[in-house]
């Protein structure tokens, strides 16, 4: 039998084996049988050493053509096997299009989002502007521009996440106020609220979190008085907690305001009679506020003899906890669907 006859017979046998392969594994075995290192086609190349030199190029070309033919047939058969497998799956996994579709879960706004939007809508109605700022902030705007120089003892009041010596995660949204006043270049009025996330090195527990939400407000203009602040806070308390709420101002200390006050609202659960929510005092602390310190105005470019202002800061987390009777602040951040589903029902009823 000549070499040509041997190649022709080998080709025919390879085509038969390829067509008889029913799956990918069988096809791989055929490939190894003919094209593997110890396969039949590779064996033909070993015979080349016995041929005269003038016959070797033609012989090598024919062996390569045989290899290419077998490889091409293998590729076609592999494609056909994949198609057959897919068609079989489709026939076995038929879908009854008349069956009802899967129930699609409809989400709702997060309770913190609802509370923040409620507060934003309230202040937009009062003519305030909403201003965003940087969460990664410069030490200057977070502290020094707010009357807290590097040597000020009040810096110990809030441990901070420092990235470098001069860059940190903001500990409050007050830097937005400082930057906004600086941009206005001493020209009033300024009437803004600054919502956003803030960061402090607190150990997480039922009432503390290393990350929480804060909304601060600022009004700067000529002839702004403490009575303007009190009237604003009374309106906010009634809108958030009920029309029959009263507020109480207690003297306090914040480096960036003077005078400074803590603001309490009469308990909406016991109507001031005393209960677990208000710790039997009849009052619930909701925010801090005060008249903008003259040093803060001056550092931002405002003449403190011509301009005055008030500022306040509130925590939507705490307000949401009070409004919805939530005992642990960590529930807001654990993404527990059982917890969040409760507020979908509130939203469906159109309640605030």
From Swiss-Prot:
Its cofactor is Mg(2+). Binds 2 magnesium ions per tetramer. Mg(2+) binds at residue 258. SUPFAM superfamilies: Class II aaRS and biotin synthetases, tRNA-binding arm. It is found in: Cytoplasm. PROSITE patterns: AA_TRNA_LIGASE_II. It is an enzyme of class 6 (ligase). One of its GO terms (cellular component) is cytoplasm. GO terms for molecular function: ATP binding; catalytic activity, acting on a protein; magnesium ion binding; phenylalanine-tRNA ligase activity; transferase activity; tRNA binding. It holds the Pfam family tRNA-synt_2d. GO terms for biological process: phenylalanyl-tRNA aminoacylation. It catalyses: tRNA(Phe) + L-phenylalanine + ATP = L-phenylalanyl-tRNA(Phe) + AMP + diphosphate + H(+). NCBIfam families: pheS (TIGR00468). Belongs to the class-II aminoacyl-tRNA synthetase family. Phe-tRNA synthetase alpha subunit type 1 subfamily. This is Phenylalanine--tRNA ligase alpha subunit. The lineage of its organism: Bacteria, Bacillati, Bacillota, Bacilli, Bacillales. The gene is pheS.
